[in-house]
């Protein structure tokens, strides 16, 4: 939600759309999820946690069912965040939300099978950082990286669930 340039440059307008979507879905009794984009300090004009504090209203902080964090190490010079600190802080801000990693992946053009496997293992075996931490670990290029015969142009929507993720990780 807070990645600069994805949804436009007007944070207030982006927040208004987020709030409207939350209210509509929440009113219907459906599950709600919010994915925030993490970057190291100084990469974006406003850091993820500051954006969430400033633009997410309290009723949404208390009511969103899932809060996921999207992060790509390759896009951030290999920076490894302190996930314990991040998820502990998010748990205090979103006390009723289930927390997890919403997107991750080895995106570098130079990524090897070994680097993908190591990164996937690191994310898929992350400990439970906070009381409501549920994991997540949506590997963005799962089909391309883990489904036999799927090339680099394969759609993430194809063959969804075709293979067990743990088995595919072992075979990567």
What are these regions (language model features)?
Residues 1-11, 33-38, 137-141:
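Active-site groove signature of glycoside hydrolases
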Residues 11-20, 45-54, 79-89, 113-126, ...:
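Well-ordered, non-membrane alpha-helical segments in soluble/globular domains
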Residues 36-38, 48-83, 87, 97-107:
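Aromatic- and acid-rich polysaccharide-binding/catalytic face
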Residues 98-172:
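Substrate-binding cleft of secreted/luminal carbohydrate-active enzymes
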């Amino acid at each position: 939600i807070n990645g600069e340039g994805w949804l436009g440059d007007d944070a207030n307008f982006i927040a208004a759309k987020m709030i409207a979507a939350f209210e509509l879905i929440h009113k219907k009794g459906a599950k709600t999820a919010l994915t925030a984009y993490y970057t190291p300090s100084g990469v974006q004009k406003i850091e993820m946690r500051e954006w969430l504090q400033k633009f997410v209203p309290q009723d949404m902080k208390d009511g969103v069912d899932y809060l996921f964090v999207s992060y790509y190490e390759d896009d951030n010079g290999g920076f490894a965040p302190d996930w314990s600190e991040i998820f502990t802080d998010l748990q205090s801000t979103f006390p009723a939300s289930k927390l997890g990693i919403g997107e991750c992946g080895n995106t570098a053009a130079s990524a090897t099978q070994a680097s993908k496997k190591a990164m996937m293992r690191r994310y898929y075996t992350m400990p439970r950082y906070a009381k409501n931490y549920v994991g997540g670990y949506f590997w963005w290029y799962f089909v391309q990286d883990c489904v036999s015969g799927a090339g680099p142009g394969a759609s993430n929507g194809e063959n969804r669930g075709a293979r067990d993720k743990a088995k595919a990780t072992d075979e990567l």
